[in-house]
Amino acid sequence: MTKPPKAYWIANVTVTDPDAYQGYQAIAPDAFRKFGARFLARGEAETLEGQDWQRRVIIEFDSMEAARACYASEEYRAARAKRAGACEADIALIEGLGAV
């Protein structure tokens, strides 16, 4: 049986209210841990084209199913509620290529 390909959560974020955003940062890690997420990159990035976001984040999950479950989880819904109004964000999930 083959393992499903990894999945990647890609977030582009500009924080507009740093104090309120701390509420998100305090509880979001619990959701990511629960679903086995691994942070591959985060912080400022050099924008070559497109919108210039303050922060970029790339998180790896063992599968698309795990990434979706994390996003839909009660833990992450609570974190998203803390994030609302504290930042502008685009979040996408993308499936990895698997063995190439």
Question: Model-derived features: where do they sit?
Answer:
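C-terminal structural segments of small proteins and small subunits
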Residues: R68, Y76-A92
